[in-house]
């Protein structure tokens, strides 16, 4: 059961979660709209109305710190009692501890790492599952193509946690193509070319190595592997092009490929 994000940005959208669950051979995913009625629902009503009567749950799997229901009234002890009364199996996942400081792995820590651009630690905490941005490729200004490095442009969903603005070595998968491609991605507001806008939109622009196809209007997923540098404002397009060439070289080294 995946409530929609209403309070804080999400690391994965419901669509991205669905793709991961599909790869694990999960048959169905139920998305509960996080309305005011659901937000004010008691823990018992949620278990009875949603888990039992609607989903006919046979097994419930939650983290050890899981809280639910109005004002977070429900927890593990409540679930143990409810599951015992209704012959439902309950699996409680223990907290994962990481590092010498024995810090608890949490979604907030992962968000903090993304905003710091620390993909190295992020990958360690997620068992090497990269942060990703996915969506349909939009038609941009084609400025990259004019400068000699055409890019795939994605507009992240508003509910999505955006990593630190900057340049990353990335991996790209394209709808209808079984191959993975290596890339170099800029996340940010394109300060060199969008200086006139008072509130420039956040974009994810990716140059893909060794790809000649047309992926406009196709679904694309970009996996973030390593942070290379912060986003910068350059004096002009010539300086921007020179910086991109250096970014491509750095990304190629990360990927272990030759340009």
Language-model-detected regions and their locations in the chain:
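An acidic, carboxylate-rich microenvironment
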Residues: 16, 45, 78, 109, ...
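A non-catalytic, amphipathic alpha-helix used as a structural packing/dimerization or gating element
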Residues: 16, 121-128, 239-250
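Residue-level signal for inorganic ion chemistry
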Residues: 21, 60, 122, 170, ...
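General small-molecule cofactor/ligand-binding pocket signal
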Residues: 29-31, 89-93, 223
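Hydrophobic pocket-lining residues within nucleotide cofactor-binding pockets
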Residues: 34, 95, 228
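Glycine-rich, Lys/Arg-enriched anion-binding loops that position phosphate/diphosphate groups
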Residues: 83-189
């Amino acid at each position: 059961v995946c409530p929609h994000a209403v309070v804080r940005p999400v690391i994965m959208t419901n669509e991205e979660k669905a793709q991961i669950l599909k790869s694990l051979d999960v048959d169905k995913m139920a998305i509960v709209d996080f309305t005011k009625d659901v937000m004010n629902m008691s823990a018992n009503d949620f278990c009875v109305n949603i888990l039992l009567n609607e989903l006919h749950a046979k097994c419930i799997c939650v983290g050890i710190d899981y809280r639910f229901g109005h004002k977070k009234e429900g927890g593990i002890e409540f679930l143990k009692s409810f599951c015992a009364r209704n012959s439902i199996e309950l699996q409680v996942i223990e907290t994962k501890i990481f590092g010498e400081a024995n810090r608890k792995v949490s979604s907030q820590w992962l968000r903090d790492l993304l905003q710091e651009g620390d993909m190295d630690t992020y990958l360690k905490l997620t068992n090497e599952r990269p942060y990703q941005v996915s969506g349909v490729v939009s038609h941009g200004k084609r400025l990259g193509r004019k400068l000699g490095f055409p890019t795939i442009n994605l507009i992240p969903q508003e509910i999505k946690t955006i990593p630190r603005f900057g340049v990353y070595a990335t991996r790209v998968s394209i709808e209808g193509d079984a191959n993975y491609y290596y890339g170099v991605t800029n996340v940010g507001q394109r300060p060199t070319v969008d200086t006139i806008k008072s509130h420039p939109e956040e974009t994810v622009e990716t140059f893909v190595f060794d790809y000649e196809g047309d992926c406009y209007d196709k679904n694309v997923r970009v996996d973030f592997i390593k942070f290379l540098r912060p986003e910068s404002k350059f004096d002009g397009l010539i300086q921007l092009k020179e910086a991109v060439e250096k970014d491509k070289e750095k990304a190629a080294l990360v990927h272990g490929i030759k340009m």
